[in-house]
Amino acid sequence: MKRITGIPTRPNMVQQMLEVGFDYYNQPSSDGSHYWSDNVAYEFTLAEIDKIEEATNELHAMCMDFVADEVKQGDYAHYRFTDLQKNLIEQSWRENAPHLYGRFDFGYDGNNLKMFEYNADTPTSLLEAAVVQWQWLEQVEGLPNRDQFNWIHEELLTRFSMLQQQSGKAGFHFAAMTEAGREDWGNLDYLADVAYNAGWHIHRLSIEDIGYDDDTQQFVDLNNQPIEMLFKLYPLEWMSNTKYAPFMLNSATQFFEPAWKLLLSNKVLLAKLWRKHPNHPYLLPTYFNQHDITERKSIWVKKPLLGREGANVFYYEKSNGLEFAAKGSEHSNFYANAGYIYQQKFELPNFDGMYPVIGSWVVGDVACGMGLREDFTAVTGNDSHFIPHYFVE
């Protein structure tokens, strides 16, 4: 794994970005640098890519087994779920509600590969990973004999086609919050476009414009048309706490992601996976509280069970009991009362003052590509940059 700099900018880079809907490429970081640059990339070997792909497939299979066990046992003590959320989880799992995609976040130092978390509900940077970095790979000059771990787009097409065949439905609604930024809507537009090319009739709307028809007992759009299939770039834990949430039970609407993914998008997963698979090579020791930690010399990352963009992350030193805010993490009262886990700190490599995190994508049940984000700190937050990758044999 190497960080390559000095790659020439494509003469028509801006035009290429805009043509694929990546109009937030120049979103600024705090230092004024842009979210995307043609000039930097990460180089991997084929052996490293094989390792990442194999780990992703193995961890996803472990997570699916984990969901099955959790539902079978019905032990949701650590999650702080409502009764309705428990019912939604169990109903969606019993009905084999299909899923679309997810993204593992990995730390990798060229030798050790460790799972940080599974963004199984509302992962973004999909457009960047599936389309933008592939376009870059095909057009950039000066990188001979390169390839990329990336067939995300093809797997999405296959998945949307399969969903249509299985459901027998024709229409698919795609929704996000009205006030969501261009990154969210850019990712949503991309998914809607893929679904359209797979044969679906597409409808876009804001989450706030979803209604419920008491007479037909169906979720409907602004035209009072039934919503049969809904992809929502809106967290399940939020949606399942709205006034319409009780209507999700026994609803004719198929939600993406399904409610059983509440078990994977919550960081309870990390502690329970470690308990179930102690010393697994791709897992970091993770516990629910400080008292369970036995490795006194390690630094531990205190993460909220529900949190996004590196919010509310702390470091804890077992040897002296000190706890302090992690550099690069912003505090949000929204996540302050969500509960926490303690995950052993993994030392990310420092390349020219930047810390990369690998996002490895799963579509359906298939590992199919990756993208990287790097930040000025070991906590990946709103200042991060998306960096393309390639590999050489």
For the regions a language model picked out, list residue spans one by one.
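Preference for protein termini
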Residues: 1-393
